[in-house]
């Protein structure tokens, strides 16, 4: 026991912190999916993802390019629809209806954000839940909530994989999710609950936030505030998952967690970049492969 304790805690009580390598884990998943795609191809099943982008938001361009690159890497097809900013909602809905009908399209992804004249909820709802590889359709979210089969939002699904593949137990743990967005916070809390954690969702109106986050065995930060989480928000030995992608005062990429401050007291932590980020695409590709067999 003493040896294990010595390994876990340094002389000054700091931890031997495990750095959770999202790049390596996402690569492992992509290689597994590559194998699955080849097996499907051998059976004559070709998987294709349709990616729709409206306008040319620079961040969206990068994400969309990487998603198509990911398809190429695992050996599935991708169709690309780059529509001008002034595309009407009706035109976009017509394209989605056409792709819903096509037997040679397995997944449909509409990159967000959309221009302000298009209603995102209406667009998401138009996607066939059987092709909703982003897991944003109300039917997909509802299915997740009541434990039925359906696509799961990629970033939170990726975080579960990061934890599992790093041998971090979730069952029975106190998990605090900071942030309540539809894309991350809400599905994250539902997934942790499905893994039998005790889950608290904290947000901008939470009182005594530090007291709440200090309870966490696993803390997931998804608030979009650069370096907000310092060591006084956490207890010793916490596992910290940082979903934030922000720029600090020097325009350097940083997360919602002040990594240098928090890292010494964690048992495990995800870096930014190279933590959660690469997992989103891996899980999107996972959903594309799953679309072949999913029944909703
Ligand atoms: N914009 C930011 N993240 C995402 C995502 O996961 N999916 C889509 N479609 N758009 C996004």
Predicted regions and their residues:
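Positively charged, low-complexity intrinsically disordered leader regions
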Residues: 16-45
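Anion-binding alpha/beta catalytic cores of soluble intermediary-metabolism enzymes, centered on
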Residues: 109-170
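Glycine-rich phosphate/diphosphate-binding loop of Rossmann-like nucleotide-binding domains
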Residues: 54-68, 150-233, 239, 254-257
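Short beta-strand elements in bilobed, periplasmic/extracellular small-molecule ligand-binding domains
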Residues: 71-85, 199-201
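Short, well-structured alpha-helical segments in soluble
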Residues: 91-103
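Glycine-rich phosphate-binding loop
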Residues: 104-115, 119-122, 216-248
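Rossmann-fold NAD(P)-binding glycine/threonine-rich loop
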Residues: 123, 244-294
